[in-house]
């Protein structure tokens, strides 16, 4: 009889443990800032920025950009300019963007690769209406998940769904037909600067961008040829 009772209680115990686990996981941290407010304030901050350091990673077997990795500095004042290292077509090359033209170091010298827009218009990243600020403004169903440290900055992870139109505009190359899962890491205190953003364009395919040194002066010289 005791064995029967014990066997009967096992499913009940398992269910109770499962429910307890779910309750703990689903419970929001009351100390985290409200997600919608974080997104709104971060979007407002990002909209005013004119320079940043970028680490971009594109993963998956269906690339949404013509490059897979990029590390560099970007400014939009007095004009769009950038410098760093990018990986495209299996090659990792130092690059410079000046006056709308892309230069890549092939060997010991830089060569013109033509208009930067033919690869990716880097100016879109900080465009007040089409760039990161617009991505943040177009995340819905947002939830503050937890605090993580991104490049030494305490950041709140916000999850939600991003508008397909916002990302299509941002990348200049994707043709998404449905909204997609998105994550944004936003500085917990201060002006709520964006520290990282990630979107899943399709299963197994992700665009992730980490950002730092907001507002730091960036000087880019046109390379000699």
UniProtKB/Swiss-Prot annotation:
It is a lipid-anchor. Residues 1-21 form the signal peptide. A lipid is attached at residue 22 (S-diacylglycerol cysteine). GO terms for cellular component: plasma membrane. The keyword 4Fe-4S does not apply. Disruption phenotype: A double lprG-mfs deletion strain is more sensitive to the antibiotics tetracyline, vancomycin, rifabutin, clofazimine, novobiocin and ofloxacin. GO terms for molecular function: lipid binding. Induction: Part of the lrpG-MAB_2807 operon. Modified by Lgt on Cys-22 with an S-linked diacylglyceral, signal peptide is removed by LspA, Cys-22 is further modifed with a fatty acid on its amino group by Lnt yielding a triacylated protein. InterPro entries: LolA/LolB/LppX, LppX/LprAFG. Bacterial LAM blocks host cell phagosome-lysosome fusion and is one way in which Mycobacteria evade the host immune system. This is Lipoarabinomannan carrier protein LprG. It comes from Mycobacteroides abscessus (strain ATCC 19977 / DSM 44196 / CCUG 20993 / CIP 104536 / JCM 13569 / NCTC 13031 / TMC 1543 / L948).
């Amino acid at each position: 009889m005791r064995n029967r009772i014990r066997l009967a209680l096992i499913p009940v115990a398992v269910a109770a443990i499962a429910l307890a686990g779910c309750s703990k996981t689903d419970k929001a941290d009351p100390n985290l800032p409200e997600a919608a407010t974080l997104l709104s304030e971060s979007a407002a901050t990002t909209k005013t920025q004119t320079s940043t350091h970028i680490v971009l990673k594109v993963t998956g077997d269906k690339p949404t950009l013509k490059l897979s990795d990029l590390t560099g500095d970007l400014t939009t004042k007095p004009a769009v300019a950038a410098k760093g290292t990018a990986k495209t077509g299996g090659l990792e090359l130092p690059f410079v963007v000046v006056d709308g033209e892309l230069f890549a170091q092939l060997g010991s010298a830089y060569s013109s690769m033509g208009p930067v827009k033919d690869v990716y218009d880097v100016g879109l990243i900080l465009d007040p209406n089409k760039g990161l600020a617009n991505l943040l403004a177009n995340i819905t169903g947002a939830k503050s998940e937890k605090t993580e440290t991104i490049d030494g900055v305490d950041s709140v992870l916000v999850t939600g769904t991003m508008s397909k139109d916002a990302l299509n505009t941002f990348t200049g190359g994707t043709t998404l037909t449905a909204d997609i899962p998105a994550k944004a890491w936003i500085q917990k205190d201060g002006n709520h600067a964006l520290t990282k953003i990630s979107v899943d364009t399709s299963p197994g395919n992700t665009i992730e961008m980490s950002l730092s040194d907001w507002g730091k002066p960036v000087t880019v010289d046109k390379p000699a040829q």
